[in-house]
From Swiss-Prot:
Enzyme class: ligase
Cofactor binding summary note: Binds 2 magnesium ions per tetramer.
Family classification: Belongs to the phenylalanyl-tRNA synthetase beta subunit family. Type 1 subfamily.
Cross-referenced InterPro entries: aa-tRNA-synth_II/BPL/LPL, B3/B4_tRNA-bd, DNA-bd_dom_put_sf, Fdx_antiC-bd, Fdx_antiC-bd_sf, NA-bd_OB-fold, Phe-tRNA-ligase_IIc_bsu, Phe-tRNA-ligase_IIc_bsu_bact
A Gene Ontology molecular function term of the record: magnesium ion binding
SUPFAM superfamilies: Anticodon-binding domain of PheRS (SSF54991), Class II aaRS and biotin synthetases (SSF55681), Nucleic acid-binding proteins (SSF50249), PheT/TilS domain (SSF56037), Putative DNA-binding domain (SSF46955)
Domain of life the protein comes from: Bacteria
Main localization category: cytoplasm
EC numbers, comma separated: 6.1.1.20
Statement: the UniProt record of this protein carries the keyword Nucleotide-binding: yes
Source organism: Bacteroides fragilis (strain YCH46)
Name of the protein this chain belongs to: Phenylalanine--tRNA ligase beta subunit
Residues reported to bind Mg(2+): 467, 473, 476-477
GO biological process: phenylalanyl-tRNA aminoacylation
Amino acid sequence: MNISYNWLKEYVNFDLTPDEVAAALTSIGLETGGVEEVQTIKGGLEGLVIGEVLTCVEHPNSDHLHITTVNLGNGEPTQIVCGAPNVAAGQKVVVATLGTKLYDGDECFTIKKSKIRGVESIGMICAEDEIGIGTSHDGIIVLPEDAVPGTLAKDYYNVKSDYVLEVDITPNRADACSHYGVARDLYAYLVQNGKQAALTRPSVDAFAVENHDLDIKVTVENSEACPRYAGVTVKGVTVKESPEWLQNKLRIIGLRPINNVVDITNYIVHAFGQPLHCFDANKIKGGEVIVKTMPEGTTFVTLDGVERKLNERDLMICNKEDAMCIAGVFGGLDSGSTEATTDVFLESAYFHPTWVRKTARRHGLNTDASFRFERGIDPNITIYCLKLAAMMVKELAGGTISSEIKDVCAAPAQDFIVELTYEKVHSLIGKVIPAETIKSIVTSLEMKIMDETAEGLTLAVPPYRVDVQRDCDVIEDILRIYGYNNVEIPSTLKSSLTTKGDCDKSNKLQNLVAEQLVGCGFNEILNNSLTRAAYYDGLESYPSKNLVMLLNPLSADLNCMRQTLLFGGLESIAHNANRKNADLKFFEFGNCYHFDAEKKNPEKVLAPYSEDYHLGLWVTGKMVSNSWAHADENTSVYELKAYVENIFKRLGLDLHSLVVGNLSDDIYSTALTVNTKGGKRLATFGVVTKKMLKAFDVDNEVYYADLNWKELMKAIRSVKVSYKEISKFPAVKRDLALLLDKKVQFAEIEKIAYETEKKLLKEVSLFDVYEGKNLEAGKKSYAVSFLLQDESQTLNDKMIDKIMSKLVKNLEDKLGAKLR
């Protein structure tokens, strides 16, 4: 949330610099990410000056350009080519000089000397939208005749500077979602640190009802969802541009001024955290505001022009005939104030956080109002803010306050009563804090001391502190204001440590595999278990019907639990690729979740749900980057296969005991599965389909492996580590060049080889593949190396030849192989 330094000073007096304020707020739990100097107009109009057009003639090479000379108040006139249709001699204009930076949203461009259709142009005569003082681009700005050439534009437009503090508000601190809320905490900090400070806010004592010419009735039909609703009317207003001071306040914190009435409501919400809504009173049919729910499926068009279907639990603000606003979330298209509005009805309410949160999530909306209502605002500030808003409307838009405040309140919000003992304060904080200091802190935080004893205090905590309802909550507040850095580390630490205990084998092996992968150049990633259900639309390998859906998702992008780690990794790859980092190796350990409707059991609610622990590997980009020693070499699925095999070896699995099969589905264009002999799937790895990559805007090939960690742990239960002496006898290598059908895979050769010679054959490796000229159609050549070794003697040629002859015969019989 953006907090204005100068605005903050209106509520609490201090002599701290912006950086000191940021440090103070961070120290008391309102973490401030940064301090930025800003101006009411982006860029501060630096480099812009007022000029006078001395001459203006048509460009010889254009039918719409003009060549002008402009007096910038610095002596010699400046030549500028201008394309605006309204440029003329004698005008006072705004000129961007060489080197000036102009902003278009987040983009910036610099004014440079240029030639336009062969004529030199030194600068630019500007339109409103080009310098950020308006939205018109119909022509250049023409200033009044009394504008003085050479005057800096920032002085002419009275550009103000301020500092914006980026305060990160945690979900429990709804009370700090405003300038006044932050000022309250800063005031407590100042008092604790011995500084003279006072907390103030504008008085509304001057509020007075002038007549009863526009009386609008208020009815609340659902007091659970709306415990308090208040409204007042102002008649005879003029909707127009806000005064400069109000526009500047909003611009500084990043808001765009709209008109005086709307700007007042935005000012109030950012000043005091109370969302307001302004209705055109003449559009309230029947002269009554009704707070209620609507039938399921009712359509309603919001301010953004989107037609939405309402849920029966969406609280609505209605008139006698129509819905006007989604309560606490978003206004309607046809009920708000416009430039033609003359009478307004101002709403100030307290809506139940849960109702607002669920409605906002259902419609995928996140507004300034819903952000505050769903966290819980101060129910007792509604009337104050309503009075202040009405007074401001009267002052800035004219008119008269034309009704009594209609305040429908089921029951006034009560303070939270908390019993606090000094002993517990000392126990939780770890330091004895004097009672007077504790009383000073709680008082500065607007907690009332209802009773006091030698043992502690009875406190009344204001209802806007929704996060402080227990003694431990109060103690946390005491600690953050007292200062975490003021609690010394004790000279002795009491702890209970043991060096004995059960070691989780799975965790230990996970760490070993993680270290192995990191050593191979992988980076570990951690993705959210929540993901987007749309990823699974139309998939057969991971059907949408098996998704574990969230009843109340944070957003449409986080509305289900993941069935696979794949999509999170592809998001990470896309994120890195967009930042010019395309050579990637990722791994992730995480749970995957599954729903099976066939397992539903009324007596076991969780029966249809399951989760498995998986390891995902992603490889993409180059395996070797271009250098003096190596040319570029792209990674391949075989590299991924090696990583998978090495993981199996690290876990102690015998690769020859596993069953490998082919796979091609909507995830992989080509892949292999690795199963136990009992049919349990241990891993799948292969090439991700182009269609899948396109959905994530990934251009490079991606190779993905999915290892079921749970099944791997089961598979290695019987694995035992054995040790043996290194053989004293040499190993012998024999190579074969085999002519085979193209459909034959190396895995088949490997399997036959190990079945043929189980004792002496130690390794089978493929070192060359050839397909092309001089081979029969449909054939390919494999060059395969066989490593033989006897642990008890040196192998002689006769023994080796016997093994190789048997091996060749089996390859010929089973695969139709021929020696080349």
